[in-house]
């Protein structure tokens, strides 16, 4: 193997346009040389959510410039990269088309191999880039489009242990915020309001707590929030804070039960693992401090290492896409043909049962 491999990564699956140059050294260590992300928050905030057509147009307008900026920041030219990695799914099909077609064009023009990357795999492998984790480990992905507990056995080897049967957790945060008249994105707005609220004022449900299966459900909690708000309308600022705090507490207690059962299962299935077992958290909701504290305490109780990559690498970014490509290259996996097509739905675990449920990105992958 050469002393290092260098990849250009491209990410356009939802409402962030991103490009990155990442290096994998011969010892397996990863290094982010440049990482450029352009958020579309302003374009979508007036609509209270992501508008697919607007997102796709924004990717078209920004991506070429971001690729140039990523190369400039890294001090390299296209000739210096070993491959191109572009998100191919899951996500909004318009955005995926923009990023994948750009990746194909660059790969063709520069004579470089193309790796079409599963966005979820990027999240799953990020902890190996940031913390050098060894396989296997558990990953909790909590975002606007996905809520999944996944066993990460190896590159390309994923086993879904739990998923949402209805709303994704990030979607529940956004809808709660919208119901209460809080700004988009809803996650930070709910968290900020909750800091001033009484988490015990409203006894909100904790969906699926106590069940042996490791799946999640948040639609009932969202409905309970609506009922609580309607019952005391019109809402004062303190009412809103109390509802947010109660909602956040219910979410944290639900995750504590669901993930706690997952950690116990991991110990049973991997009793002789070398070193400390690990739980990785990824996705935009992973920025929530109460959720992080809950998961940290849970890991401490079960003897797990809690790994939360920096916030900028928990949300959508191109560094994780580049790294996933590097992981595949390092294993000698074949590059993708330029005819590869984007996939709006692309589960990490292809053998897992498809559950009913729709989030911002459509059917749960």
Curated annotation (Swiss-Prot):
Residues that bind substrate: 141-145, 174, 187, 288
Family annotation (InterPro entries): ATPase_NBD (IPR043129), Gcp-like_dom (IPR000905), KAE1/TsaD (IPR017861), TsaD (IPR022450)
The entry's keywords: Acyltransferase, Cytoplasm, Iron, Metal-binding, Transferase, tRNA processing
Cofactor(s) the protein needs: Fe(2+)
Reactions catalysed: L-threonylcarbamoyladenylate + adenosine(37) in tRNA = N(6)-L-threonylcarbamoyladenosine(37) in tRNA + AMP + H(+)
Localization: Cytoplasm
Broad enzyme group: transferase
Pfam families: TsaD
SUPFAM superfamilies according to UniProt: Actin-like ATPase domain
Binding, Fe cation: 119, 123, 316
Gene Ontology biological process terms from the UniProt entry: tRNA threonylcarbamoyladenosine modification
Note describing how the cofactor binds: Binds 1 Fe(2+) ion per subunit.
GO cellular component: cytoplasm
EC number from the UniProt entry: 2.3.1.234
GO MF term (any one): N(6)-L-threonylcarbamoyladenine synthase activity
Main localization, broad class: cytoplasm
Record family assignment: Belongs to the KAE1 / TsaD family.
HAMAP family in UniProt: TsaD
NCBIfam families xrefs: gcp_kae1, T6A_TsaD_YgjD
Record function comment: Required for the formation of a threonylcarbamoyl group on adenosine at position 37 (t(6)A37) in tRNAs that read codons beginning with adenine. Is involved in the transfer of the threonylcarbamoyl moiety of threonylcarbamoyl-AMP (TC-AMP) to the N6 group of A37, together with TsaE and TsaB. TsaD likely plays a direct catalytic role in this reaction.
Protein name: tRNA N6-adenosine threonylcarbamoyltransferase
Species this chain originates from: Agrobacterium fabrum (strain C58 / ATCC 33970)
Gene that produces this protein: tsaD
């Amino acid at each position: 193997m050469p002393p290092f491999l260098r990849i250009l990564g491209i990410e356009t699956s939802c409402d962030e346009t991103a490009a990155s140059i990442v290096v994998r050294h011969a010892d397996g260590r990863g290094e982010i040389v440049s990482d450029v992300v352009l958020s579309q928050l302003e374009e979508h905030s007036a609509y209270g959510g992501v508008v697919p057509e607007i997102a796709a147009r924004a990717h078209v307008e920004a991506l070429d410039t971001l690729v140039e900026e990523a190369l400039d920041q890294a001090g390299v030219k296209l000739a210096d990269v070993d491959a191109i990695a572009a998100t191919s799914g899951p996500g909004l099909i318009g955005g995926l088309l923009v990023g994948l077609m750009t990746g194909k064009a660059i790969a063709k023009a520069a004579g470089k191999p193309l790796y079409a990357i599963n966005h979820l795999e990027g999240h799953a492998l990020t902890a190996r880039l940031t913390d050098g984790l060894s396989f296997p480990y558990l990953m909790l992905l909590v975002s606007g489009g996905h809520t999944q507990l996944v066993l990460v056995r190896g590159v390309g080897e994923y086993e879904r242990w739990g998923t949402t049967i209805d709303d994704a957790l990030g979607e529940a945060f956004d809808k709660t915020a919208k119901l209460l008249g809080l700004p988009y994105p809803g996650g930070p707005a709910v968290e900020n309001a909750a800091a001033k609220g009484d988490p015990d004022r409203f006894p909100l449900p904790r969906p699926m707590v106590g069940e042996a299966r490791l799946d999640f459900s948040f639609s009932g909690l969202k409905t309970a929030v609506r009922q609580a708000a309607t019952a005391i309308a019109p809402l004062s600022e303190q009412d809103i804070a109390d509802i947010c705090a109660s909602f956040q507490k219910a979410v944290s207690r639900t995750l504590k039960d669901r993930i706690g059962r997952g950690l116990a299962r991991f110990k049973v299935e991997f009793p002789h693992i070398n070193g400390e077992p690990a739980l990785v958290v990824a996705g935009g909701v992973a920025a929530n401090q109460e959720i992080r504290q809950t998961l940290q305490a849970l890991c401490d109780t079960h003897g797990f290492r809690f790994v939360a990559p920096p916030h900028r690498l928990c949300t959508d970014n191109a560094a994780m896409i580049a790294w996933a490509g590097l992981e595949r290259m390092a294993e000698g996996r074949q590059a993708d043909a330029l005819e590869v097509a984007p996939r709006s739905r692309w589960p990490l675990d292809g053998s897992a049962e498809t559950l009913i449920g729709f989030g911002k990105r459509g059917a749960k992958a």
